[in-house]
C-alpha cells in the first residue's frame, strides 16, 4: 500500500475553481467518509486552506484509488471529472511524501515561507485522527511533515520577513494608499485570520478599526484585544457593513462564508455616501476568504481596488530569498530520503518478526518432542537444553535478520522481504497480523492546548465505517 495525493491549489487553478472545491471542517469528514467507503482506500486525510484542497490517502491500487478520490471531489465541487482533472495534480508514493513535506515547510505556499500552513497541516491531521481515519502510514507521514516544517523554519531564514498572506495583502494596500497610518480599517471576520489582520493593522498605525462578525460576541473579544494594544476599536454586527464601508479606507475580509458577504450593492452604497475620488481616496478591499468574500463585480467599480489571493501570490514580497528557498529544499530532500529509509525498514520488520515467531514455534515443538522421547529428563537438564537450542536459533537468525533490514532500506528493498517469506514459507496472513498488532502508537489525540488537556488515545483501527 502507498500514499496517493490528489490536489488542486493556487498553482494549478484559478480562484474560481478553488471556490468550487472549498471544503470546511464538516465537509472534510464527509469527504473522508466517502473516500473510505471504497475497499481500495484504508486511510485518508484532507488538507484544505484558502490556497489548496488536497486529499492524502493510503490505497491498495493507484488507478482505482485515483478514480475514487477524483470522483468524490468532482461530485463535491459540482464539476465533471474531466473538468476537475484539468486543474488537478497527482503525487504517488515518494512524490506524495516530498510534496507534503514541502507544503508543511511553506515552500508551496502563495507566500513562500509562511508559517500558517504548518498549523493547517496540524489541524488536518487532528480532524482525521479524531475521526479515526488515519492509521500507521498517515500518522507517521503527518508527524514527520510537521517535524520537517518546524526544522525548515528553525534552520533557515525562509520566514525571516514574517510574511503571510495577510501581511503581503496589507503591504499592497499600504502601497496603494501611500500609508496606513491614521486610516480607518474594517476587519470582517473574527477568526484566526481576522485576528492576524488586526495585529498587522495595529502595527501599521491605523487610526481606528471596526470589527464585524456574524457572532457579535467574537467581534467584541477581538475589538477588546485591539483596544488593549492602544488602537481605538469597536465591534459591530455584520448587517452594519454597508454603513461602515462608507468611512473605511482599507477592508480585510476573511470569513470563510460560502457566499460573498461584501455585495456590489453594499459597496455602491458606500461609494455614493462617501463621494470618493479614485486618485485621492480609493477604497482598498483585501479579500482573503475562500470562497471569496467579495462579489467579483466589486473589482470593476471606480475608486475600488481589490486585493485577492491570486494577486498576493504574484507580489514580489511573497517570495523568499533564493538562498533560503534552496536551503529549505535541501532539508526537505534529506528528510524525504531519511523517511523513506525508515518506511522501508518498517515494512520488512513484520516479516522478520514473523520469522522469529516461526522459529520460536519450531523450538517449542521440538522441546515437546524431547519431553515425549525422554520423559525422565530432569528439569535442570531440560532447561539447559532449551537455552542451548534457543541460543543456536538466535545466532543463526541474528546476522540474516540484521542484514535484511539493512538491504531493505535501499530502494526496491521490499523484494528482500518477499524472498524471506518465500524461503521460509511464511504465510502472508501471519505477517499482516504482526503488522496490524502494532498499527499505531498510543499518543495524545490533539495538537492544541485544549486537546492536550482533554487527552485521548489513538485508535488501533484506522478505518471506520462511513456515516450514513
Swiss-Prot record:
UniProt keywords, alphabetically: NADP, Oxidoreductase, Porphyrin biosynthesis
Active site residues of this protein: 50 (nucleophile)
CDD domains named among the record's database cross-references: NAD_bind_Glutamyl_tRNA_reduct
InterPro entries recorded: 4pyrrol_synth_GluRdtase, 4pyrrol_synth_GluRdtase_dimer, 4pyrrol_synth_GluRdtase_N, GluRdtase_CS, GluRdtase_dimer_dom_sf, GluRdtase_N_sf, NAD(P)-bd_dom_sf, Shikm_DH/Glu-tRNA_Rdtase
Superkingdom, taxonomy of origin: Bacteria
Region (Disordered): 443-468
Gene Ontology terms for molecular function: glutamyl-tRNA reductase activity; NADP binding
Record-level GO BP terms: protoporphyrinogen IX biosynthetic process from glutamate
Positions with a binding annotation for NADP(+): 189-194
Signal peptide boundaries: none
Catalytic activity: (S)-4-amino-5-oxopentanoate + tRNA(Glu) + NADP(+) = L-glutamyl-tRNA(Glu) + NADPH + H(+)
Note: During catalysis, the active site Cys acts as a nucleophile attacking the alpha-carbonyl group of tRNA-bound glutamate with the formation of a thioester intermediate between enzyme and glutamate, and the concomitant release of tRNA(Glu). The thioester intermediate is finally reduced by direct hydride transfer from NADPH, to form the product GSA. Was identified as a high-confidence drug target.
Subunit (UniProt): Homodimer.
UniProt comment concerning the protein's domains: Possesses an unusual extended V-shaped dimeric structure with each monomer consisting of three distinct domains arranged along a curved 'spinal' alpha-helix. The N-terminal catalytic domain specifically recognizes the glutamate moiety of the substrate. The second domain is the NADPH-binding domain, and the third C-terminal domain is responsible for dimerization.
Protein's name in the database: Glutamyl-tRNA reductase
Gene name linked to the record: hemA
